[in-house]
Amino acid sequence: MYKRQDDKRRDETEDNEYRHSRGRNDRRGRRMRVRDRDYDERDERRGRGDRNDRNDRNDRADRMDRNADRDQRNDRMDRADRDQHRDEPKEDLVPVAGIVDVLDSYAFVRTSGYLPGPNDVYVSMGQVKKYGLRKGDAVHGSIRAPREGERRNQRQKFVPLQSIDSINGMSVEEAQHRPQFSKLTPLYPQERLKQETTPNKLTGRLIDIVAPIGKGQRGLIVSPPKAGKTITLQNIANAIATNNPEVHLMVVLVDERPEEVTDMERTVQGEVISSTFDRPASDHTTVAELAIERAKRLVELGQDVVVLLDSMTRLARAYNIAAPASGRILSGGVDAQALYPPKKFFGAARNIENGGSLTIISSALVETGSKMDEVIFEEFKGTGNMELRLSRELADKRLFPAIDVNASGTRREELITDPQELPIIYRLRRLLGGLEPEQAYQTLVPRLKKTATNRDFMASLIQQSGNATNGN
């Protein structure tokens, strides 16, 4: 038994000695390998200087060969691309025209009017900045024609604009140097828009006497319901088209009846822009904003533009519905923030110092029984420089044109009135000032009917005044 234990201890001792010796040999081998690697690196550093020249020459030769191979491959690819493009049919482009509507992060070319439509063309903000496009610009460009078998709305809702040929009738380079509307100098109206056309058109003749209109006028037609404001606007539009054909006439109808829109389109020789009452309030505001921006772009080119708006009250109502609530509510339920966009619209009217003018004549509703309409009118009451008031009493008695002579007038009318006629008009004003609206109407209108023109009417007043003086 003791002998077996001694043998076991001896075997364990021999195993331990073998493991220790093997570990020493492994460590010794690793040290030798590291030393050999260090020797090799040292030898390489010593001999590198001799090999650098040969390696550099070889590297340059290799690079030249690789560049030559790459050039040959590129030439072959270019020839293949040219052959492919020559064989392929060229992409067809379709001309397109419309009004630019710039939104927050993109823009559209409205091709079917001033409202959004399915055929509108998408314009990126990069193109807007590149070409200097502004809201209201009239552009002519081109889009890609749909390929054979490709449906319009197959991949994208709106077709992108490919190129622009002209902006407002000018080249793209010329459009870059046009002035900005906000930097133009406004003045009082100095050139008259004559309203007199024929002897039987008493509305225009009466307006020329009591409330003359000039280029750059900012006027309000204050009217109760059923007093003839729409007919008055039609007469003003037709008179401007007849006497001043150089003026660009725009009639903006907001929240109106469809039949009135049709009647206006058939009777007015101008651009009629409308949004009927069956459309949402956002469409009313969109039409008004794009129309006034279009007018500004024309004024920047030195043109005379007249905008007839029917009505400012309905436009303010639409903004009150469509604009986000500010939390500040005026009497009648009018949001204070909703009145700023209509004021911006109305305030754009001005006579430009070095040519061009923007005239805005808008109607405003009163005596409707709505507190909101009263608040809206009071906000715009002092902003205009011309006011034409229509009388409910005269309209109820079917006395048309139902113009309240004493309540109507124009600021600085001496700038647009003939100096020879001005003293006569002042004398007539003093004569009619003490009369009631109906008496003033019955005094003035029958005498107008007896004469063919306002000049004859003025001459008759002078003659009558001279006879009265001689008689005394």
Predicted ranges, named:
Residues N243-V247:
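Conserved SF1/SF2 helicase motif Ia
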Residues L133, A145-I221:
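P-loop NTP-binding catalytic core
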